[in-house]
Amino acid sequence: MSSAEHIGVTFRSYQPGDLEVIKRITVEAFSGVSIDEAAELAFGPINGHDWQWRKARHIDADVAREVDGILVVESEQGEVVGYITSWQDTAAGIGYIPNLAFVPEWRGRGLGRLLIQRVLDRFRASGLSHAKIETLAQNDVGHHLYTSIGFREV
């Protein structure tokens, strides 16, 4: 398995200045595979807001829920190129990975796998017995990645 350093990136903790770029990455990466987009296609904009607005708000919720569960991927040039969000329900013994995304030119390099492994290691260190990640059926890339790591469809 490649390390982040060999790929030319650094994994670091989330900083408040990352919020807007992470939202932009999210909206771009989730086009075609977002439940919010599917809902908009079925029902139109909801309450006057498009799916991109709703999806970006998921990042606000992730930051509010567990800011320490966010890892950011930064290129050697200091550009944020991807991220993962996670949170832990220690009472239930479950860790959640709600969002994982990269800018297009950084996809397919194994970084998503590395981020998920880091998060799963954190979950295990916290004594969690299960992890949950969700995706739509049309997200072939996500399905392949998640099952190759050991997630099972339920």
Spans of features found by a protein language model:
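Conserved GNAT acetyl-CoA-binding A-motif
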Residues: 123-134
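Acetyl-CoA-dependent GNAT
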Residues: 7, 13-17, 24-99, 103-105, ...
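Acyl-donor-binding surface of acyltransferase catalytic domains
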Residues: 1-8
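Conserved beta-strand-loop-alpha-helix junction that forms the acyl-donor binding cleft
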Residues: 107, 133-143
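Residues forming the Rossmann-fold NAD(P)(H) cofactor-binding site
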Residues: 113
